[in-house]
Regions:
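Conserved beta-strand elements flanking the ATP-binding pocket of the protein kinase catalytic core
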Residues: 42
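Catalytic "initiation/cleavage/transfer" segments centered on a nucleophilic residue
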Residues: 91-98
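Short, solvent-exposed polar/charged micro-motifs at secondary-structure junctions
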Residues: 51-55, 98
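Short, surface-exposed ligand-recognition loops at beta-strand->loop->(often short) alpha-helix junctions
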Residues: 11-22
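Active-site-flanking beta-strand signature of metal-NTP-handling nucleotidyl enzymes
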Residues: 3-11, 52
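An amphipathic, aromatic/His-enriched active-site/gating alpha helix that lines ligand/cofactor pockets
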Residues: 26-39, 56-90
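Short, histidine-centered active-site or binding-site loop motifs used for metal coordination
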Residues: 8-12, 57-58, 93
Length: 98
C-alpha cells in the first residue's frame, strides 16, 4: 500500500506548546473521522519555536479530500490557531522505509 507524507512548518509560541499538545491528538482524531485516508500525524519540535507537523496519508489526494470538508472542522481550527505562520514544506510519496 502506498503512503504519502505532507510536512508543514510553523512557529509555536512557548505559551502555546501545552495547549497545542493537548488538542493535537483530538484534532487529528477529528480529521481522521472526516478523512479516513489520514493515517496519523507527528509533531516535531526542531528548536527556536519552530515545529514540523508531519501528516501521513494513504492516498495522494488526501489533503484535498480533507480540505473539502473544512467547514466541518472544530478542533482542527483550534489546533491551527497555535501554529503561527504555517506553511507547507512538501508533499510526496514514501518510497522507502527502513
Amino acid at each position: 500500500m502506498a503512503e504519502y507524507v505532507t510536512v508543514f512548518r510553523a512557529k509555536v509560541a512557548e505559551g502555546d506548546v501545552k495547549p497545542l499538545l493537548a488538542v493535537e491528538p483530538k484534532a487529528i482524531a477529528e480529521a481522521k473521522r472526516l478523512c479516513p485516508e489520514l493515517l496519523g500525524a507527528d509533531l516535531v519540535n526542531i528548536g527556536d519555536s519552530t515545529w514540523l507537523h508531519v501528516l501521513r496519508w494513504s492516498a495522494a489526494d488526501s489533503v484535498e479530500r480533507l480540505m473539502a470538508r473544512a467547514e466541518e472542522f472544530d478542533l482542527v481550527h483550534v489546533m491551527h490557531g497555535y501554529l503561527a505562520d504555517a506553511e507547507e514544506v512538501g508533499h510526496g510519496e514514501v518510497v522507502n522505509r527502513s
